[in-house]
Design a protein with these regions (language model features):
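Polysaccharide-binding and catalytic clefts of secreted carbohydrate-active enzymes
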Residues: 1-89, 101, 109-114
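Alpha-helical structural signal in soluble globular domains
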Residues: 5, 81-89, 114-123, 148-149, ...
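Loop/turn elements at helix/coil->beta-strand transitions in domains of secreted/extracellular proteins
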Residues: 9-13, 90-95, 155-158, 184-187
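Substrate-binding cleft/loops of secretory-pathway carbohydrate-active enzymes
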Residues: 16, 88-136
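A residue-identity detector for tryptophan
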Residues: 22-23, 119, 173, 214
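A short acidic (Asp/Glu
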Residues: 25-30, 106-113, 138-141, 173, ...
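Generic detector of short, locally flexible boundary/turn motifs and exposed helical patches
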Residues: 59-64, 94, 154-155
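Substrate-binding cleft of secreted/luminal carbohydrate-active enzymes
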Residues: 124-216
């Protein structure tokens, strides 16, 4: 539907897979998200056994090699099927993945939430990274690791984007955006307009405090 709307408006359709992953929060009591009927039955059919009970996202994925292969495969198959379906009607449609680096910074999440065979620069036009936790924790060193992460996945600077969460002036979101701009990405995106308006920022945004001194 989105590709159709964009095409009707005279645009080249551009579709995002927004945070397509296995979400897990250790403090909300929901447990691991792998055990719905479809996932468990598909795993059983493929491997002839029940999926291992995984209790934490800090587990070493090498100890569960079949699950570590199967789970990202489902994500990759899902996005690949959508790409094929949409491009059958809109062959010039462009696709990007929004990938949150911070919430995947655990041994298991790094493996199961990035299907390396499918999420490549050959299949996607852009990889967009984000890391709101690093921004809100005021850690520019970690924000930089998020900004740079796409290179390790094989995406050139022109094939990458970075999403920055707008926050109050005590966080370093503007500095993070300027750092990302320095890498020559396709885009640096500020999220979101409602935050921008509620806080009351004005345009143009600050380019940072700079001083120059000439001593002749």
């Amino acid at each position: 539907d989105m590709a159709s709307i964009q095409t009707a408006a005279g645009l080249t359709p551009y579709v995002q897979f927004g945070e397509v992953q296995w979400w897990y929060f250790p403090d909300d009591g929901s447990g691991m998200p792998f055990y719905d009927a479809y996932t468990t039955s598909t795993f059983q059919a493929q491997y002839g056994r029940a999926m291992t009970v995984i209790t934490t996202n800090t587990i070493d994925p090498a100890t569960i090699p079949q699950e570590a292969s199967f789970l990202p495969g489902l994500i990759g198959a899902f996005t690949s099927q959508i790409i094929s379906y949409v491009r059958s009607a809109y062959p010039y449609c462009r696709f990007e993945v929004l990938y949150p680096i911070d919430v995947n910074d655990t041994p298991l999440n790094r493996v199961i939430n990035y299907p390396r065979s499918e999420w490549t620069s050959a299949n996607l036009n852009c990889l967009k990274t984000e890391s709101f936790t690093y921004t809100y924790n005021r850690n520019l060193d970690l924000s930089r690791t998020s900004i740079e992460a796409g290179g390790a996945f094989g995406f050139l600077s022109a094939e990458r984007s970075h999403l920055v969460g707008i926050s109050d002036p005590s966080t370093a979101w503007l500095k993070e955006a300027r750092i990302a701009e320095g890498y020559g990405f396709e885009s640096v995106v500020l999220f979101a307009l409602d935050q921008f308006c509620l806080i009351g920022y004005s345009l143009p945004l600050s380019r940072g405090m700079r001083r120059s001194l000439w001593q002749g």
